[in-house]
């Protein structure tokens, strides 16, 4: 009888299988499950890094005093232990972030090598070096800085190796974290403006750690005290400008490059070029009395805290925004599920 026909017979040939033949909801592929809120994952990650780093630093300091007393490691200022604890936990925290979907693979995160990668890398390196070289040229030409007289050749080669190493290592880690994982994961749920603002704000924040004096003694909770003093630069609003604007603009430009090219090679190149020239600026030049008087314009040895750097990098950002134009057609690597 018709009511006794099974589901396949009622459906007829070529029809989709009945519901009982489909996997149960709990067995559906993982991509069909609701994703964790990236903003919540980011807050949890930051909380774990800062709280864990503050708790870990005193133990590492005590361990160094017990195992290698009087060594260079044991004599490092306590803030260095806090710095390294934060960095170590930030790197270790990348694994659970990857498990939460923040590292969908080297291609999706932006570090796969493609036909345009070499051109983007060279363009970024050229733009990064040229922009800060322009700041240095202005400072030297107007008497705010002077060349360091006759650095020894061996010392110069040491600087070159260290500057290149720092440029590659720091740029790779920061671009992977801030533009690859943080911005990329936020971008898959939120608009470019929201994603770039959050990732750039975090990027700027970590560059405003103070270097406070060592504590009188180190105890289990000294890490929290030191961390509070390191973050105290945010309480002095006047000292934030123009550095916070410059770093925020840098973060926004790097996010824009990630958005427009679909990869991290252009932002990596820019970042590496800036770090290399920043290290070279510190090594090859010294401040003059005129530069000290115009510190608000020329900035300190950190370079990004002067208005001259802000103006030059703002012009650099305009050039790159105009040159990149519209996003690649069909590029959905940042917004697809």
Where are these regions (language model features)?
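N-terminal, membrane-interfacial amphipathic/helix-forming hydrophobic leader that caps
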Residues: 2-10, 15-119, 123, 129, ...
């Amino acid at each position: 009888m018709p009511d006794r026909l099974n589901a396949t017979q009622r459906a007829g040939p070529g029809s989709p299988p009945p519901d009982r033949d489909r996997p149960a909801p709990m067995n559906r592929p993982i991509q069909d499950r609701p994703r964790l809120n990236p903003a919540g994952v980011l807050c949890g990650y930051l909380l774990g890094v800062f709280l864990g780093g503050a708790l870990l630093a005193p133990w590492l300091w005590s361990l160094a005093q017990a195992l290698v007393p009087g060594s260079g490691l044991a004599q490092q200022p306590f803030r260095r232990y806090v710095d390294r604890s934060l960095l170590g936990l930030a790197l270790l925290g990348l694994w659970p972030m990857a498990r939460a979907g923040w590292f969908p693979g080297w291609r999706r995160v932006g570090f796969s090598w493609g036909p345009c990668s070499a051109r983007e890398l060279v363009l970024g390196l050229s733009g990064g070096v040229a922009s800060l070289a322009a700041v240095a040229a202005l400072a030297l030409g107007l008497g705010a800085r002077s060349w360091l007289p006759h650095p020894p050749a061996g010392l110069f080669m040491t600087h070159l190796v260290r500057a290149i190493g720092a440029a590659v290592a720091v740029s790779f880690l920061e671009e992977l974290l801030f533009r690859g994982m943080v911005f990329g994961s936020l971008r898959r749920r939120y608009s470019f403006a929201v994603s770039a603002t959050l990732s750039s704000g975090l990027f700027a924040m970590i560059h405003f750690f103070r270097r406070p004096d060592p504590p009188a003694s180190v105890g289990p909770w000294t890490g929290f005290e030191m961390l509070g003093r390191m973050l105290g630069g945010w309480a002095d609003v006047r000292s934030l400008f123009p550095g916070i604007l410059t770093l925020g603009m840098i973060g926004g430009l790097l996010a824009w490059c990630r958005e427009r090219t679909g990869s991290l090679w252009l932002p990596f190149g820019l970042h590496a070029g800036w770090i290399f020239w920043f290290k070279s600026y510190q090594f090859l030049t010294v401040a003059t009395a005129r530069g000290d008087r115009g510190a608000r314009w020329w900035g300190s040895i950190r370079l990004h805290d002067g208005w001259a750097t802000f103006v030059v990098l703002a012009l650099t950002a305009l050039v790159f925004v105009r040159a990149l134009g519209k996003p690649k057609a069909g590029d959905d690597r940042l917004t697809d599920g």
